[in-house]
Amino acid sequence: MSNELDFRSVRLLKNDPVNLQKFSYTSEDEAWKTYLENPLTAATKAMMRVNGDDDSVAALSFLYDYYMGPKEKRILSSSTGGRNDQGKRYYHGMEYETDLTPLESPTHLMKFLTENVSGTPEYPDLLKKNNLMSLEGALPTPGKAAPLPAGPSKLEAGSVDSYLLPTTDMYDNGSLNSLFESIHGVPPTQRWQPDSTFKDDPQESMLFPDILKTSPEPPCPEDYPSLKSDFEYTLGSPKAIHIKSGESPMAYLNKGQFYPVTLRTPAGGKGLALSSNKVKSVVMVVFDNEKVPVEQLRFWKHWHSRQPTAKQRVIDVADCKENFNTVEHIEEVAYNALSFVWNVNEEAKVFIGVNCLSTDFSSQKGVKGVPLNLQIDTYDCGLGTERLVHRAVCQIKIFCDKGAERKMRDDERKQFRRKVKCPDSSNSGVKGCLLSGFRGNETTYLRPETDLETPPVLFIPNVHFSSLQRSGGAAPSAGPSSSNRLPLKRTCSPFTEEFEPLPSKQAKEGDLQRVLLYVRRETEEVFDALMLKTPDLKGLRNAISEKYGFPEENIYKVYKKCKRGETSLLHPRLSRHPPPDCLECSHPVTQVRNMGFGDGFWRQRDLDSNPSPTTVNSLHFTVNSE
């Protein structure tokens, strides 16, 4: 567009209602004021001139000065030059009233046109002196009037009748629309910010153009779909973003929340070298195989000792109808494993929940969580001999409450910052693979493993091993059918027998049978500690004899005083949990008749977990050495 500015003639009629196609307003002022919603500041003009948009500056300056000023001081400017005319005519203005009475008659109109139309190609100085509108903003050189080539005017060629204003209540839509066309603004997709100090910022909305791509990208080399396998397992949780190269995919889970695990065959069970359509799969939560079995069992025992109940399992299966519609014979083979049978011709789905946190395997606070593996082993059990045919794993980290969702959001924010810092780095392909983990993918594929020889480490506490044997979930029973059991079940018993607790653990478990007593003589005020090797009357007599030098056979009467003050002969077997009427946890008892040795009270402690004396049960007793 040239630097020359055209103006179309604007015809204003008295009491004209609005009849525009795109802008419906009650008056002309509202229409233009709405169009000029932002003030035209000096900074805005300067920025538009820098962008080479002088024509828009001139046009907007004209509209703003006209419609934003007082109504009684507006200038009526008329132009007769078209947009394609080489010659331009500029006219003087005149003050007008709101009703435009002088322009209603043809005589006044012709007089106005003949007095104000000038053929001079330069701007007259009278416009500035009379405070009329100046068009210096549209000139290439500010402050100097640029001469324009003379050309024919429409006023000279047209007839007088063409300029007569008819008495009508409608706007001339063509004249106003032509003014809109002469203003070259920004495209509709961009918003013009007058006070912005930036020239343009089109890259801000396209910081991550690869995320918005709809074309499928090739999966990462570590992804399971890129590998050919007879079985395909998925976990209904989003895949973690930050995964080291060569590691299994990782998913974040919430403790106690159930997630779907889907098992299927890509070919619908066709082409599989199986003896039957039904296979048995074992879903288990295990540690990485790099940890030796002894260390893994030590971790599980540490976790189990901190649980509120001994029946707490590592992995649970949801009791819902969808599980029983696709799988059958669900069995809890260990505390960290469960098995079921499913048909390879159909898709199987079970809902599992993990009840341990990644930080439950250390007594220290603030340590990094230990990642676990969700492992699925599938056995062919059609001909009576079970054979491991497939294994797949994925890493899982378990958080409390809604920690899994928070961890995913934190990883996404870190990934975004990394993309902003190095958008054109050489490892953009790797980052694209990382970003593909959360592009609408709410499942995590388990990666197939080639190692089918290493047996899994299953955790079965010693206190419940016998019950598992009775239920047929741990060790094979004697008989001809024992050889038909799964290899997994046959390995449960050897694991428990082979990896017994360490010798230090055995010694500490023996110390649990010991009892610590506090006794004193009748003349003493301070109690002395007395250790009983066995929690019975014989152990008490033996300890008193060793500490105070009394012959053990001389201690033949031992009394106990109940809370109600009653005294009775102590049973030869000291109970580790006395009845409530024998509990007294405050002060030693008073003197009892026929008490010749002294008094004391029962105080028991766990030597393994707490080295400091802690009162568990208190029992007052009296020893008579007569």
Swiss-Prot record:
Subcellular location: Nucleus
Signal peptide: none
One GO BP: establishment of planar polarity
Keyword Glycoprotein: no
Keywords: DNA-binding, Nucleus, Transcription, Transcription regulation
Pfam families named in the record: CP2 (PF04516), GRHL1_C (PF25416)
Record flagged with keyword Transmembrane: no
Tissues/organs with expression: Expressed in brain, colon, pancreas, placenta and kidney. Isoform 1 is expressed in lung and tonsil. Isoform 2 is prostate-specific.
Superkingdom per UniProt: Eukaryota
A GO cellular component annotation in the UniProt record: chromatin
Grh/CP2 DB domain mapped to chain residues: 226-460
Entries under InterPro entries matching the protein: CP2 (IPR007604), TF_CP2-like (IPR040167)
Location of the region described as Transcription activation in the Swiss-Prot/TrEMBL record: 30-95
Any GO MF annotation of the entry: chromatin DNA binding
Assembly and interaction partners: Homodimer, also forms heterodimers with GRHL1 and GRHL2. Interacts with LMO4.
Family membership noted in the UniProt record: Belongs to the grh/CP2 family. Grainyhead subfamily.
Job of this protein: Transcription factor playing important roles in primary neurulation and in the differentiation of stratified epithelia of both ectodermal and endodermal origin. Binds directly to the consensus DNA sequence 5'-AACCGGTT-3' acting as an activator and repressor on distinct target genes. xhibits functional redundancy with GRHL2 in epidermal morphogenetic events and epidermal wound repair. Exhibits functional redundancy with GRHL2 in epidermal morphogenetic events and epidermal wound repair but is essential to form the epidermal barrier with TGM3 as critical direct target gene among others.
Further remarks about this protein from its record: GRHL genes (GRHL1, GRHL2 and GRHL3) show a paradoxical lack of redundancy despite their extensive sequence identity in the DNA-binding and protein dimerization domains and the fact that the core consensus DNA binding sites are identical. They have related, but remarkably different functions during embryogenesis because of their differential spatiotemporal expression patterns during development.
Noted disease: Van der Woude syndrome 2: An autosomal dominant developmental disorder characterized by lower lip pits, cleft lip and/or cleft palate.
Name by which UniProt lists this protein: Grainyhead-like protein 3 homolog
